[in-house]
Each structure stands twice: as structure tokens, then as C-alpha cells.
Amino acid sequence: MIIGKSPCSVCGEAGDGAHFGAEACRACAAFFRRSVALNKAYVCRAMGTCVIQKNVRCMCRACRFTKCIAVGMRKSAVQRHRELFASQETSSESSSNPRISPTLSWPMDISPQSYEETGMPTLSQLNENYNQMSTVRRVIHNTGGDNIFHRREPKAVAYTDAHNVHLKEIGLVADWIIKSYPDFEQLHQEQKKLLYRNFFLPFMILECGYMCCLNNRTDILFLPSGDYIDCNRPETFYGHRIKSHLISPNEAVRMFGPSFEIYRRNVLDPMRRENVDNFEFFTLCSLVLWDHGLEGQTEECVQMARCNRERILREVLYYYRRVKQISDPSMRLANLLVLLPALQRSVRRFQEDVEITHVFNVYSVEETFYELVSGRLSDSFFQTTQLTTSVEEEKVIKTEEIDSVWDLNKGQLVEMYEFPTPPLHTPTEMDPSTTQL
């Protein structure tokens, strides 16, 4: 039996495996590697409307490179020193053999303009920084001293573990936002806090829905640490760790168990039904972040939010038309936007649950997490949020070089390192705490 290769996600030709984070043929992989290594800048003469398919001769390099980024190819995965050696070898060959004059540039396509000006720069930047955040997460949430290079079976966690995960996420997600949106850093401190406290909780729930899409499951809530909350067995979440004299574990399950069904009905099922992908997830996150009409929001912040919303909507429409080539992009975008009101219902339910637990002392909630959920942040949040790692963890991180990141402890850019991301594991049938769909 002959098994056909997966098609190239850029041009549709027979694929040659995963290259730089996406399925690609050898030609597209070589094109992307050389473009990044030589820092090429292309401009499309057709305003970014070119078709990128295997049967098109002389494909537009600007649109081809834009599509490479859109399908998930990462510039940080290109090892530039290999191209440097290749260039040296080429120069040596050309000097020794004057009959050979390889072309290292394409004058018709070179321009001071960058491909991002006609493509989807913000969504691509969000995607790249999100991948880096996922790398950092593997270290930050490695509290058990496990080898981060070995695949770890996820487990159902209790509320204390989930809250600890989310506390660490506050700084990580803030760093992701600051790196992805230069405009955000220009805002006044109070406006940053206003937008972020309105964003973090919806993002936390949205990401659960996105992870459910990736794993095609809605019976569990995936956490950034890789563990999960079993929606069908809320007793594993509350269990016997409820120490309040006001409520028993069984009463806690009866009181808060229905919330899981609300999350599933309003967020998980709709997102899985629409099969929301990474760029659509980033679009939803951006629309939630750049909200308007918030109490205390300045006119400058409102205008900045509007500009960023319009930019994101233009980019996702470009993504639908030029990358995914959807026949009716407007309808697809409308179905995506319909998810936002349902998301807000889940957010309100979560806030109500946390408020009840805090007022009646049902179970302990960290003050920082409670303040964020209830819409309050300390004045020095963006200066004092700390992400601590041990000396051993810092050594482990330094494996393969990638882009620098913002260190919230030092308040400056520092070098970060990346290592191969293992496939996400989900609970198996052998796990007695697992509930299959």
C-alpha cells in the first residue's frame, strides 16, 4: 500500500515533511530559508492578491513569503549560519569559475518595503511570540523537577494547582501582549492596567477553547501547564481539599459543577464546531484586548484600540482570502465574532464563582488572582510582576538560540532559548480519571 505525502501547505505540491514549523515541499522550504537568512524584502506588484499554487509559474515572491509565514513557518527556526557558509561557498565557486554567476537576489522584487505591509504582520507576530511563550511555559510550570525534554503524562488537577498555574500566567501573558503590540507599551500605566484586567480572564477561557479545538475534546479544560480540569468529574477539581467549615466538597461540586457545563456550551463546543485555528484565536484575543467603552478609558486609548481592531480585521480578511482562500470570508468572520458574546457569559459566570468563594470563604483564592478577576490590579503591576526560575531551569533553557524576550524581573531584553516542542498529550483510556467523549 502506497501512502501519499501530505501536500505542501504553501503551494500544494507534494510535501517533504515539516520544515520550520509547517508541512512544505523542498522548493518552498529552500525559498523560505534563503529569504530569511539573506534578510530579503519583497514587494508585490499586484497589492498582495497573487495566487500561490504549484501550477503557477514564477510565483510572486512577496505573496509566497507571506503565505509561508501565515501557514506557520517560523523565521526563528532558520539557522542563519548555514546560509552564511552556503554564500561563502557560492562566492568561492563563482570566483574560480567565471562562467557561473548565480543570482542571489531578484531586483524586480526587492524594495525597502517589507512584506508585512501588505500581509498580516500583527497576526504573524502574535503567532511567533505565542510559540515562544509556549516554550517558556514548559520551564515556568515545571514545578516537579521533571525533565522538560521528556514527555509527561498530564493529570487532572485540583483548584489550588489551577490557581497557581494562572498566577504564573499573569506575567507571561502580559509579556506576550507587550512584545506583540508596540502600541500597548506607549499607553499610560493606568490604561495598560485597564485593558489588561479586562483581557486576562477572557483570554484564559478563550485559550481553553482553542486547546479543545487542537485536541478535539470538550470534556476537559486544558491548562497552560499541560494538565487539565476534568469537567465530567468536578470532584477531582474540588475533592477533599475544601477546608472551609461553611461548605463540604460535595456541596462545592453541586454549587460550582454547573459552571463547567456553561463553559462547554458557550465556549468549548462553539469553538470546536467552528474549528477555530491559531490566527482566528489571535484575532479573538486582539478584539478582546482592544476593547472600548471601558470605565476610565481615555480618548487616546479608545482611538488606539479602534486602530488596532481595524488592523486585525483587515489582516484576518486577508488571511481568509489569500491564505485559506475561503469562498465567503465575510460569513466566516461573522461566525467568528458571534463567539464573543458567549465568551462574556462565561466570563461573568467565572467572576461570580470567584466572588462567592471569596465572600463566603468557600476555598482560598490568591489575592492577586482575585484582584485581577474582580477587575483590580495593583498600581505597580507591570513593574513588579515577577517570573522566577531556578538556576537549574535557567541552564536548561539555554539549549538552542531563538529571539530575545522581555525579562519582567530585570526590566530589559534578555536572550531566550528554544527547544523542540513535544506533541501535546491528552489523557488516555488507561487513565481511570479520564472521561472520553
Curated annotation (Swiss-Prot):
Biological process terms in GO annotation: regulation of DNA-templated transcription; regulation of transcription by RNA polymerase II
Subcellular location: Nucleus
All residue ranges annotated as the NR LBD domain in the record: 115-376
Pfam families (UniProt xref): Hormone_recep, zf-C4
Binding region for DNA: 5-80
One Gene Ontology term of the molecular function aspect: RNA polymerase II cis-regulatory region sequence-specific DNA binding
Signal sequence extent: none
Chief location: nucleus
Transmembrane segments annotated in the record for this chain: none
Zinc-finger ranges (NR C4-type): 8-28, 44-68
Tissue: Expressed in the pharynx, intestine and hypodermis.
Keyword Membrane: no
UniProtKB keywords: DNA-binding, Metal-binding, Nucleus, Receptor, Transcription, Transcription regulation, Zinc, Zinc-finger
Similarity field: Belongs to the nuclear hormone receptor family.
Physiological role: Orphan nuclear receptor.
The protein, known as: Nuclear hormone receptor family member nhr-28
Origin species: Caenorhabditis elegans
